[in-house]
From Swiss-Prot:
One of its GO terms (cellular component) is cytoplasm. The gene is lsm12. Belongs to the LSM12 family. Residues 1-71 form the Sm domain. CDD domains: LSm12_N. The keyword Cytoplasm applies. This is Protein LSM12. Keywords: Cytoplasm. It comes from Xenopus laevis (African clawed frog). GO terms for molecular function: RNA binding.
């Protein structure tokens, strides 16, 4: 194990034995001396050639650590991060969470919240306006959020949103039917297969 002042170089290949007597070998991808945590990149347990397992090892529970191959050249540079893209993604995630929180605090029913999430998966341009769902600034769905509660200018947008609402509630009903009576469902499947 790494003693005082010792460390594992990124890219080195090491072998160690865990407290469960399992032998692990892999390439060092990270090492934190204060916490004695070692991250190893090992061949994939799924057997896929282009995949790898990353194992985090607490060196307090590892013995017999041996450096098999020390890295001689400098490790490749880290990939650059697109800070603008990351900031945009974080902003969008925050807006979505705030929208969900708004719906809950406004007293929107669970059906309304679920419908909003279903619509939002397909059409990102949807928002809350008090207890109403506004889609693409063209369609307004008011409580109790059924197809007949969809209002807007006749056209493709209204038709599309109505289809999403209709499918959402059909899927919810199908889910309830399956959850209500799984025994009857399995008996029905058995009787039709015989």
């Amino acid at each position: 194990m790494a003693g005082p002042g010792e460390y594992f170089a990124i890219g080195a290949y090491v072998s160690c034995r865990t407290c469960q007597e399992t032998r692990l070998q892999g390439e060092v991808v990270a090492f934190d001396y204060p916490s004695k945590m070692l991250a190893l990149k090992c061949p994939s347990s799924s057997g896929k050639a282009n995949h790898a397992d990353i194992l985090l090892l607490n060196l307090d529970y590892v013995s017999d650590v041996e450096v098999i191959n020390e890295r001689t050249q400098t490790p490749p540079p880290l990939a650059s991060l697109n800070i603008t893209k990351l900031a945009s993604r974080a902003r969008l995630e925050k807006e979505e969470k705030l929208s969900q929180a708004y719906a809950i605090s406004a007293g929107v029913s669970l059906d309304g919240q679920q419908l909003f999430q279903t619509i939002h998966k397909t059409i990102k341009d949807c928002k809350w306006q008090e207890k109403n769902i506004v889609v693409m600034d063209e369609v307004v769905i008011s409580p109790p959020y059924q197809v007949e509660n969809c209002k807007g200018k006749e056209g493709r947008a209204l038709t599309h949103v109505c289809k999403i609402v209709e499918k959402h509630f059909r899927d919810v009903e199908n889910q309830k039917g399956v959850q209500r009576n799984p025994v009857a469902q399995s008996q029905k499947e058995t009787s039709t297969s015989s």
